[in-house]
């Protein structure tokens, strides 16, 4: 799941693959802004067949947070 999510970050958001680790913070380390976060949520919902509500979205601080959610819910 990590590799699939990492590839999305590289392909869609143009993030340097070397910067993407499980511990990398979405906003601080990867520079993802609110519009990109909305795109991230939409794409994850479509690609991984999950629903991410606002309450869950606010818990996503790191790449690992998103990956663990996707692993548990897809």
Q: Model-derived features: where do they sit?
A:
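Phosphopantetheine carrier-protein modules
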Residues: 12-31, 48-59
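Thiotemplate assembly-line natural product biosynthesis machinery
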Residues: 1-18, 71-73
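Two-component histidine kinase catalytic core, primarily the HATPase_c
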Residues: 36
